[in-house]
Amino acid sequence: MTQTAVELWQELACPRDHSRLEPRGETLVCEHDHEYPFVEGIPVMVVDDEIPPTQPGYWAKPEQIERVRAAEPPPVEGEAVDPYVAELILGTHGNLYKDLSGGMPRYPIPDFPVPRGNGELLLDIGCNWGRWTIAAARSGYRPIGIDPSFEAVVAARRIARQLGVDDARYVVADARKLPFADDTFDVVFSYGVLQHFSKSDVALSVVDIRRVLKRGGYSWVQMPNALGALNLVRLGQRRFREGDEFEVRYWKPSELKRVFGRIGPTELSTDGFFTLNPQKRDLDLLPARFRAIVQVSEALKRAHAPTTLADSVNIRSVAA
């Protein structure tokens, strides 16, 4: 491992005990001898011996890493879309995008929903192929994307390079055991990710989000509101059970304020109605029947429909 590579990752810390890391060959090692491999420039910082995965089979074990390395496709050229994005589009973007699983004319990269940055360090939790990480970089931030899937992180780096996004960096890591030093980030962002966690795992993630945020920094997390019309229908369809594995968990606004309030002062705002991924920038990619959902959602936002009735809400918490 080159010294230049190590210097790029000065923000990293042991996800188990938060101690500093030092290079040792092709690994990073903490003062308690916990080791983490550096694979082709990507730190692999998961701790699957301490906590079970949030989704079965979603870890970066050595045999999985080797399979990914052996099968990684060549970078696509020009404006073509990496096949990985189409393959995962339903899981990463939701039902409105299901018709794009066979391919799409461009990358569905959204407008970044927080105020434009000026070089602030931002953590994108659950980046997958990097749509929000890329959006953050284009909006003036220095983003680091994390995901527990080595395959996803490799794809994210490949796509960022294709698009000429040089400021994005990626780490294989878990939201509940963030591999960063205390007081590192100006902003912690997550969209469409923590909604798949159990409520106890969200609480664990919130503790670590607060730890890695600088005082006065803030988190911006999208979550589903249990009082939204679409979400009530979906809850009824599964007989109001909590959900398991990668199913969406639905939260009441009071629950969200209580849990995320552990970071600091917390406010909820409307993300959208009748969908958990209302991206108006992607209207040209959607069929008419789904485009109408996003357009209605935008109209309700302009009319200041109550946030308490939105299906998707944003939670902004300032680190106290």
Per-region residue spans from a language model:
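A C-terminal cap/extension of S-adenosyl-L-methionine-dependent methyltransferases
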Residues: 3-9, 20, 234-239, 268-320
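Class I SAM-dependent methyltransferase SAM/SAH-binding core
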Residues: 123, 129-177
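A conserved beta-strand element that flanks and buttresses the S-adenosyl-L-methionine
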Residues: 189
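N-terminal auxiliary segments of SAM/dcSAM-dependent transferases
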Residues: 2-78
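Acceptor-substrate binding/catalytic loop of class I
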Residues: 238-255
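Conserved class I S-adenosyl-L-methionine
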Residues: 46-117, 135, 219-242
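A short glycine-rich, Lys/Arg-flanked "PGG" loop and its adjoining helix->strand segment in the class I
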Residues: 203-215
